[in-house]
Amino acid sequence: EIEIEDESLLYKNRIKEIYKDLDPNRFKLFDALPLEEYAKFYTLFDINLAYVEHNAFASCKSEIKVIESLHYGCIPVFSEYGGYKDFWRAAPDRVKHKNMAISVQSPGPWINAIGHWVENFEDGKRRAAQLKEYSDDIYDINKHCEDRLSFYLQRTEEFNEAQMNMIAQYVD
């Protein structure tokens, strides 16, 4: 039995296995960066891969990696799963392309999607900019403050009412 102290090593080894047949000069795996340097790595590449395993944990992940990559001008290629799938379903058809959201886990469709964007780079940048415009609109906190405040106030009222009902049970 082999004991592995770092679970990220398992992930890195899985990624290396998936891409073992590709030229190592064409891609690079990045370790986590400190917060102050986090966005820096997005400026290093044109195409962002946001792959998630198809499991219960990953199904709860948000779409943040896709949104971040769009913010920095990357062409996204991501798993059509979990939060990524929710984001993709909500996006208007005019900004979608089949080589952005990949619904299968096998390497073939991912390699084809990456190859498509390498060969059609300008179209990819244009489509990524359109998707960014959509995501910037729905993720701009300033455009949704009133809705959020209304939601919190409604929940506060419901909570207060529930507390009053609970107290009333003991007062009678």
Predicted feature residues:
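Nucleotide-sugar-dependent
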Residues: 36-43, 48-68, 78-88
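Structural motif corresponding to alpha-helix initiation and N-cap regions
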Residues: 32-35, 63, 107, 117
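Hydrophobic/aromatic residues located in beta-strands of well-ordered beta-sheets
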Residues: 1-2, 76
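Nucleotide-activated donor-binding/catalytic signature segment of Leloir-type glycosyltransferases, i.e.
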Residues: 3-42
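CheY-like receiver
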Residues: 41-44, 113-117, 151
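A charged, aromatic-enriched C-terminal amphipathic alpha-helix characteristic of glycosyltransferases
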Residues: 105, 119-166
